[in-house]
Amino acid sequence: MAETQTTTPKKKAERRAPPPARARKNRPAAPAPGPHASLSYLRVAPRKVRIVADEVRGMKVGDALAMLKYTPQSAAKPLAKLLRSAVANAEQGGGRVDVDALFVKTLTVDQGPKMRRFMARAMGRAFRVEKKTSHVYVELGTAARG
């Protein structure tokens, strides 16, 4: 009589949890951000938004809004709206905030996705047109009075 061998079914390899993150040595924790606002997928090229953003960075909010009101670039209107949103977030944040003391602490402009389109040209050709978008982030700070 032939002996039948019984095999045990193979177990699937169990996944291990990743090792815990190492604590950073001698580095303070990142400070909590102040009042901030962000704008995603702005349909203006980042290069053009940065021209306006460089003028506004570091200014008091009231002065920045006044300047943006009379700036002819297409990015000025959305940036002014973003600043007003950040001021509203500062007022809504719970603590008493002096709106006159707020200034633009950080203002970053990053590139968003490009929308690729084609423009018909002569003799059956087509040129690619890239419609660029921007992501804008603004954080406000309070000027220390002294």
Swiss-Prot record:
Disulfide bonds: none annotated. It comes from the Bacteria. The keyword ATP-binding does not apply. Residues 1-39 are annotated as: Disordered. Part of the 50S ribosomal subunit. It holds the Pfam family Ribosomal_L22. SUPFAM superfamilies: Ribosomal protein L22. GO terms for molecular function: rRNA binding; structural constituent of ribosome. Signal peptide: none annotated. Belongs to the universal ribosomal protein uL22 family. This protein binds specifically to 23S rRNA; its binding is stimulated by other ribosomal proteins, e.g. L4, L17, and L20. It is important during the early stages of 50S assembly. It makes multiple contacts with different domains of the 23S rRNA in the assembled 50S subunit and ribosome. One of its GO terms (biological process) is translation. This is Large ribosomal subunit protein uL22. Gene3D superfamilies: Ribosomal protein L22/L17 (3.90.470.10). NCBIfam families: rplV_bact. GO terms for cellular component: cytosolic large ribosomal subunit. Keywords: Ribonucleoprotein, Ribosomal protein, RNA-binding, rRNA-binding.
